[in-house]
Regions:
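Short solvent-exposed loop/turn micro-motifs enriched in small/polar/acidic residues
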Residues: 1-2, 16
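Short structural boundary motif marking the start of a folded domain
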Residues: 2-8
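Extracellular beta-rich ligand/substrate-recognition surface
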Residues: 8-16
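Well-ordered beta-strand positions in beta-sheet-rich domains
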Residues: 18-20
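NAD(P)H dinucleotide-binding glycine-rich loop of Rossmann-like/cofactor-binding domains
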Residues: 23, 77, 92-134
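Glycine-rich beta-strand-centered segment in the early N-terminal region that forms part
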Residues: 24-38, 48-99, 103-104
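Conserved Rossmann-like nucleotide-cofactor binding loop
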Residues: 41
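Active-site phosphate-binding/coordination module
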Residues: 44
Length: 134
């Protein structure tokens, strides 16, 4: 029998419920995080109002704080039992900023009027990568 977890799931417009879901498997590049605190984001409210088309049963929430329960074999720089935050913005590693090693939180860029930002970026976000949460 699969181990289960509780998750907030979109059921229908105006209705989100806590449901039981199987705990996902951890692949070589994954981390399993036990959520201890999370936020309610504007995205969650848009989903609740039916303004974003999502399938019933979708697990919502994307800005949690928690503890690493299990790490994949290829994950480096973290340890099981460590408190972490999962950011809502993740790079696809195809942008010029990501290919240059700039984290997505710092890879925002401003495009001057009449100019193209396709090949440039300017770090403006101000997040520090690797902050500790205690």
């Amino acid at each position: 029998m699969a181990r289960m977890m509780r998750a907030a799931a979109f059921i229908e417009k105006g209705r989100i419920e806590l449901v039981d879901k199987p705990i996902p498997d951890v692949g070589p590049n994954d981390a399993l995080m036990r959520i201890t605190t999370t936020t309610i984001c504007g995205t969650d409210l848009h989903i609740l109002k039916g303004e974003y088309p999502v399938a019933p049963g979708l697990t919502i929430g994307h800005e949690p704080v928690g503890v690493i329960e299990k790490l994949g074999s290829a994950v480096k720089g973290y340890r099981e039992g460590q408190r972490v935050i999962a950011g809502a913005i993740c790079p696809n590693f195809n942008s010029y900023a990501a290919q240059d090693g700039v984290p997505s939180q710092d890879g925002s860029y401003l495009i001057p009027e009449g100019k193209c930002g396709a090949h440039g970026y300017k770090a403006t976000a101000g997040w520090r990568f690797g902050n500790w949460i205690d």
